[in-house]
Amino acid sequence: MDSTDNSQSVGDVQFAPLARTIIKITGSDRAAFLHNFSTNDIVKMQPGDRCEAFITSVQGKTLGHVVVYCVEEALVLVTADGQQETLINHLDRYIIMEDVELENCSGIASTWLLFGEGIPSVASELNGVEFMSPYGYCGETCQLLLGDASTAESLEQLQVREASSDQIETLRLEAGFVEFGVDVTEANLPQEVARDAIAISFTKGCYLGQETVARIDALGHVNWLMRTMTGIGLASLNAGDEIAGDDGKKIARLTSCSNASDPNQKIALGYVHNDFAESGTTIADGIQVA
């Protein structure tokens, strides 16, 4: 690795460790199999493609929110830390005669976020890492690196700065990226998470839980929608807090809260009642739907 000054080429690139669940699906039936147990159109994916999807239960609830990467001879699922047992056990019970293997790759490699405009310059200098991109966790430039214990040292030698966990959380909320187990749980319906355009295909045909998803689509809406909220009124609130309307009824519940990049603002993710979910709506003093 060239140890010369890379400060100009790396630009504003930063990195941070991020524990992830990584599941590799192999076998000739892998695409058709995952297609039958998730909300997106997996069989259309080609090597190099990436999509988001929900893994749904028979009741149509969300067992997981995953980013799916199609690589040569495999599909790779990336999601929040600690989800491997739930997802593998769920999917494994449906493997009967299919040529499908599920491999828990969590913990085999160290996982890192890399984000910023100078990523190509950094990538050309790194050896022994695999890039999963785009990831989207903290913005459009965000990539996930699969490396080892030496990855952080290599990045520091390239003068890539390590971001704080608070900074990563702010960027995640500003990107509107939901974290399973924090913003989404098994109690949620896929449409409540409000990622229909990027995580749900309404034309792909049958899959486990599809009847519930299709019924909601036919009815027109769910009562609660995931939304980004901003405003100084969030300063006194925390994840789990609820916001009531003038009549005392709950109109929002926060799932994640952080400082915004603007030091005069706060930001949160949470579920807002459908009647108040339109962008620009003021739901409380100093709190607006983004």
Residues of each region from the PLM?
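Anionic-ligand-binding alpha/beta catalytic cores of soluble enzymes and soluble regulatory domains
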Residues: 146-227
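Glycine-rich, small/acidic residue-mixed loop/short-helix segments
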Residues: 188, 194-200, 207-210, 214-290
